[in-house]
Amino acid sequence: MLESMFTEKEMKEVIKEKYNIEVIDLEKINRGSASITKIITKDKNYILKEFQDKYDKEFIIKEINIINFLKKRNIKVPKYISCKNGKYYFFHNRRVVIMQEFIEGYTINNNNGTHNQIIESAKYLGLIIKELENYEKLYSWNINEWFN
């Protein structure tokens, strides 16, 4: 897990500046390789994700494009929130930062799911793979680089 480069005060100010969203509270989410913070507002919740330095904006733009592609095909994926300037990301201390709508749910540790949870996960993975077969740009990228 990556530590945030924001203080709590800075994060609230930047969210107001970049997204025009008033933050009520912040909650750290301790999972994944990025720094993830749940953003609680009056109307809905979001996550703010700060990526490791090794992920440049081109990498993040690829991810955003794929997620938006899947969303248009009714796959349950997080919705990216655009900044006031229309971009889906910004930089803070050399890190790429994005905001997504928060999705209620649960996370299962590796090898700890029930039979039904594994079947449900496999179903969604199959749907994602099926739709990505129609994503033309995918074949022009070196996917192996994503996992190094």
What label would you give each PLM region?
Residues 27-30, 79-82, 139:
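Short beta-strand
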Residues 115-148:
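A cross-family kinase active-site recognition segment
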